[in-house]
């Protein structure tokens, strides 16, 4: 184990573990069947499911006791940021979806559940997550504690879908009232994206290196509201917040600047 090797040398001072809200939700197959209700708080009782997040936290705490280093656990929601080739990347997936919808004329429709469309949710900006990691590593009040790590605002996808569409230069389609999974919509995505990439001089012609349809379907298709409470972080001294609209819009701007998605006239 890496921490056994490093811990035995005595040079480890702090270890940060990043997990996520499946600590409260359980595995994908358990969504909607557990007693967890938002807002999720760090002290909630663990679910009666085997969860590798629980195992990771327990191993970390045990090794910290053994070798004398400090630790922190960070539980983000869906992370929005610039990361290509990532298997769990909603922001880039939606950007690719928007470009394909604009190219083909298909409707840019929210693909998830009614509960996610009309309910309350949140996200985590990768930049805020990085700041929370740095804060916890250097703050005595964060020693050996678990913290939620979300932007600090909440929204409904009914409202955010209009923001996302505007940021991608595409019209939002009316929501039909039921899920329309991207894995079903995007069966022809590969040749369409390659055509766009070659014509526009984009850096990545392989759509599977950019879009994770299944993961975005899993996030947006949850049959319940999903958001976390940040009180514990605030009380411990982490004040940062992030406008979730800017999380998406800043990402789209960078994707265009890096020639990952096409330039468009943004509404």
Task: List the predicted regions and their residue ranges.
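Mid/C-terminal beta-alpha module of Rossmann-like enzyme folds, strongest
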Residues: 130-217, 221, 229-231, 235, ...
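Conserved Rossmann-fold NAD(P)-dependent oxidoreductase catalytic core, especially the SDR/UDP-sugar
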Residues: 1-52
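Short catalytic/ligand-binding loop motif for oxyanion handling, primarily in non-cytosolic enzymes
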Residues: 23-27, 81-83, 156-158
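Residue-level signal for the nucleotide or nucleotide-sugar donor/cofactor binding architecture
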Residues: 51, 55, 121-124, 155, ...
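A conserved pocket-lining segment of Rossmann-fold NAD(P)-dependent short-chain dehydrogenase/reductase
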Residues: 79, 95-127, 148
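Glycine/proline-rich active-site loop of Rossmann-fold NAD(P)-dependent oxidoreductases
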Residues: 67, 81-97, 127, 135-147, ...
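A structural motif corresponding to the C-terminal end of an alpha-helix
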Residues: 2-13, 56-70, 236
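Conserved beta-loop-beta element that borders a ligand/cofactor-binding pocket
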Residues: 19, 59-88
């Amino acid at each position: 184990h890496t921490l056994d090797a490093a811990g035995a040398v005595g040079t480890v001072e702090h270890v940060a573990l990043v997990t996520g809200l499946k600590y409260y939700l359980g595995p994908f197959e358990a969504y909607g069947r557990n007693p967890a209700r938002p807002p999720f708080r760090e002290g909630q009782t663990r679910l009666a499911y085997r969860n590798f997040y629980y195992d990771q936290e327990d191993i970390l705490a045990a090794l910290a006791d053994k070798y004398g280093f400090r630790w922190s656990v960070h539980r983000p929601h869906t992370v929005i940021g610039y990361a290509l080739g990532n298997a769990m990347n909603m922001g880039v997936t939606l950007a690719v979806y928007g470009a394909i919808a604009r190219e083909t004329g298909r409707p840019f429709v929210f693909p998830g559940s009614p509960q996610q469309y009309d309910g309350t949710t949140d996200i985590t900006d990768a930049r805020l997550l990085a700041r929370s990691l740095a804060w916890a590593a250097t703050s005595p009040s964060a020693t050996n504690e678990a913290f939620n790590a979300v932007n600090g605002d909440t929204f409904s996808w009914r409202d955010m879908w209009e923001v996302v569409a505007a940021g991608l230069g595409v019209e939002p389609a009316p929501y039909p009232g039921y899920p329309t999974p991207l894995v079903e919509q995007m069966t022809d995505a590969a040749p369409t994206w390659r055509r766009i990439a070659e014509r526009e001089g984009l850096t990545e012609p392989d759509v599977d290196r950019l879009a994770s349809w299944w993961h975005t379907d899993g996030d947006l298709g949850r049959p319940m509201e999903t958001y976390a409470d940040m009180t514990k972080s605030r009380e411990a001294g982490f004040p940062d917040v992030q406008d979730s609209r800017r999380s998406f819009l800043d990402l789209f701007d960078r994707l265009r600047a890096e020639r990952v998605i096409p330039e468009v006239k943004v509404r």
